[in-house]
Every structure is written in C-alpha cells, then in structure tokens.
A protein has these predicted regions:
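N-terminal signal-anchor transmembrane segment
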Residues: 1-52, 72-80, 373-377, 389
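A juxtamembrane structural motif centered on a specific transmembrane helix
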Residues: 1-9, 47-50, 55, 356-361, ...
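Hydrophobic transmembrane alpha-helices and their immediate junctions
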Residues: 61, 200, 233, 331-374, ...
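Aromatic-anchored transmembrane helix interface
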Residues: 62-71, 83-128, 132
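Alpha-helical transmembrane segments of multi-pass inner-membrane proteins
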Residues: 118-145, 171-216, 221-233
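A membrane-periplasm/extracellular boundary helix in multi-pass inner-membrane enzymes
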Residues: 133-135, 235-273, 291
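Long extracytoplasmic/lumenal interhelical loops at the membrane interface
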Residues: 271-331, 353-354
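Transmembrane alpha-helices of multi-pass inner-membrane enzymes
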Residues: 366-376, 381-411
Length: 411
C-alpha cells in the first residue's frame, strides 16, 4: 500500500468516526463535510491511478446516468427559480457518491473492510456513550432539560428532538437526532461477529437496547425488536437448555419490577396525545403536499421546491416528515420513479450482491435494514444527507466484510 493509499485509509477512518457527531459538525466546524470531500477527492485519484477507469465506467453505467440526469434536473430547477435546488441535489446524492466510491475502493483492495467495520463499531460506541452520559447527568439532576437543548445547539449546531419521560419513578430525557438510525441498524451485525467474545456481544446487545430506549423513537423501537427477535432465534439452540430455563425464570421473576413501567412508556410513546400530536403534523403535511402534487403530477415543481407557507425547517425548507411525498412534490411521479427508484436500486443491487453469499442471519438482518431504510421516508425525513445514507454504506461494508471472512461464520 503506497503513501497515497495509506492517507486515503486514514481519511476513511476519520470520516467514519465523524458520524459519531449528530450532524457531523462540532463548534461550528463542518468536520464531516471536510473529511467527506477529502475522501471523494483522494478516492477518485487512487481509482484513476489503478488504470481501470473504463472498467469502472462500464460497471457504473446506472450511477453515471442517474448522476447526469440529476445534474440536469438541478440546473433546470435553478433556472426556473428554485434557489434551493443545488443544496437539495447535494443532499440527495452525497451518500450515493460515498457509497459507490467505497464500493470500488474495497473491490480494488484500496480500502480494508476489516478496519472499516472496526471504525464503525468505535463510532457507534461513541454515540452510545455520549447518550448514556447525558442521561446519567440528567437523572442525577446535574443538568436541566433546557441545558441539554442548549448544549446540542452550541456544540453540534443542531436542534435535538427532546422530551422527558417516566420509567417508574425515574424522570428520563429523550434525545433524538437524525443519525440515531445508524446504531439501531448496524449494531445488530456485531452481535453475530464471532471474533468478539460472547460477553462482548451480549454487552453490545444491551447497549443497543439502552440506546434505543434513550432515543425513544417509535420506528427505532420496532426496528430494534425485529433485530432482537431474529437474534434470539439464531442463538436459541446454541444456548444450553439449563441456561435457557434459568434465563426465562429470571426474566419472568424480574418482570414484577420492569413490566409495568415499560408498558406505561410504550403506551405514552405510541398511543398518548403526544403521539397523536406528532401524527397530526404529518396529516397536515400530507394534505398540503398532495394538493401540490396535483398541480404538477408528472414533472413536479423542481428540485428544492417547497410549500412557501408551510415549512418545517428554515435551513432545509424542502424537508418534510412525509419525505417520499415531498419528493413527489419536487420531482413529480416520473422523477420520483427515476431518481428515488434509481438510488434505491443502486443501494440494493450492490448490498444484495454480497448479502446473498452470507449466512441466513446476516441476510435477514440486511433485509431488515434495507426494509426500514425504504419504509422510513414514508413518515420520517430519512433519505437525504450524509447521516441518513450512512446506514446503506455500513450495510455494504459489513456484508463485504462477512464475505471476506466467511470461514468462521459458515454453518
């Protein structure tokens, strides 16, 4: 590995670690954007020096075509007066660019999947540790609710979704950011990595559950339960019968302590007036966006367009909870099929290429991750930007890793 390749790998590792930040920003410095730009430039140079440009172009016909059409749509939208079209296009394509480049870098052995998945684990542990520390400090009443909000704004430049919740007599704080999906989607694969001791894998499972509880998102809780159910099926027969019986007895006996508070939390998150209020916002957005789609159903209103008298964010006004519908508003039905369908096809084709060669539990985990990525934008902003796209990058890297290290994981 030459000096340029070594530098590239250092940038890749730092870039992955930067995903520990809620939005890749710290104290006003866009650390993640800087590292991603370096990654794209250095990765591009390394691939060109491989002298396999024609092979890459032939292999990436779909990606190149989709990129060209997106650039054309962006230019047309900007000419028609949509000043946000450039930002929208950047957010729409940035994760795809990193995804495709990392695919080729690993394929041509310019990047090492083993070290990449280690960096992903360290990054997720940092995210979990940060959430747990904030939770402990809040429970111990060393910090006020408003101070948590202020901390995220000043340190990370983002408005975290916060609320208080009760677990029995404990008053907890829920802190949710756009990148929380990364941990819930990718950590389950580490429960299956036999290079880690059973105690470590059990700890990672517990940390995943704690993290999901702190984030307190309905979607993430259901997703975690899907992964946990599959993991139990996978490991059930491997656990000695006596241990299984003792474990079940302990769970049932301890349910006297935890069952009622947990049920109360679930009722609050899924069926309370708080949940109803959140759903009402989506209903309003749906009505407004559907009316907008009817005005221009085929070609839409242009990249970066939005309903002028109804926005949820001043910095990205084209972003809505009902994200797929907002894409139809901007791109039209034709554009939605071409652009959103094209991006999903890129992700799915490359990930499935490697997933189909792995053991069944990795295949199922991959399908769960892909499924939730496809479903989530129907009711949450979960498609645009670096944070949302990283789960696809992670799924690709992890499946490539399992392919390379199949021996210990085969039946």
């Amino acid at each position: 590995m030459n000096k340029l390749s070594k530098l590239l790998n250092v940038v890749i590792y730092l870039c992955i670690i930067s995903y520990a930040l809620p939005t890749g920003v710290m104290m006003g410095i866009p650390i993640q954007k800087i590292l991603v730009c370096l990654l794209i430039i250095l990765g591009g140079i390394c691939l060109v020096l491989q002298r396999k440009s024609l092979e890459i172009i032939k292999s990436a016909k779909l990606e190149i075509t989709l990129g060209f059409l997106g650039l054309l749509a962006c230019i047309v939208s900007y000419i028609l007066g949509n000043e946000w079209s450039i930002k929208f296009t950047g957010l729409f394509y940035i994760s795809v660019i990193v995804f495709v480049e990392l695919y080729f870098l690993v394929r041509y052995e310019l990047a090492e999947p083993e070290k990449i998945i280690e960096c992903i684990l360290y990054m997720m542990l940092l995210k979990i540790l940060g959430k747990i520390i904030i939770e402990i400090v809040f429970v111990c009443k060393l910090i006020e609710y408003e101070a948590v909000i202020e901390f995220y704004l000043n340190m990370f430049g983002t408005e975290a979704s916060t609320m208080t919740m009760h677990l029995g007599r404990l008053l907890l704080i829920r802190v949710q950011t756009s990148s929380d999906i990364i941990v819930v989607t990718l950590m389950p694969f580490y429960w299956m990595m036999e290079k880690y001791k059973k105690s470590i894998r059990s700890l990672l499972f517990a940390l995943s559950g704690i993290y999901t509880l702190i984030v307190f998102s309905r979607v993430l809780m259901v997703e975690f339960c899907c992964f946990a159910f599959v993991a139990v099926l996978y490991y059930w027969k491997k656990i000695p019968k006596k241990v299984r019986c003792i474990g079940l007895i302990l769970v049932l006996a301890s349910s006297v302590l935890w069952l009622k508070p947990v049920i109360q939390m679930i009722e609050f998150r899924f069926f309370s007036s708080f949940a109803a209020e959140s759903d009402d916002v989506r209903q309003i957005q749906m009505r407004e966006l559907i009316n907008g789609v009817k005005e221009s159903p085929v070609f839409g209103h242009g990249f970066g367009s939005y309903i002028s008298d109804y926005t949820r964010s001043g910095s990205i006004p084209f972003s809505y909870e009902i994200e797929y519908l907002s894409f139809c508003y901007q791109m039209g039905i034709l554009g939605f099929v071409v652009f959103v369908g094209g991006v999903l096809l890129i992700y799915i084709r490359k990930i499935v290429k490697y997933a189909r060669k792995n053991i069944w539990v990795i295949k199922v985990f991959t399908l769960i991750g892909l499924g939730w990525f496809v479903i989530r934008p129907a009711f949450n902003p979960a498609f645009l930007g670096l944070q949302n796209g990283f789960q696809m990058i992670g799924l690709l890297m992890i499946n490539m890793y399992f392919n390379k290290k199949q021996e210990p994981y085969q039946k």
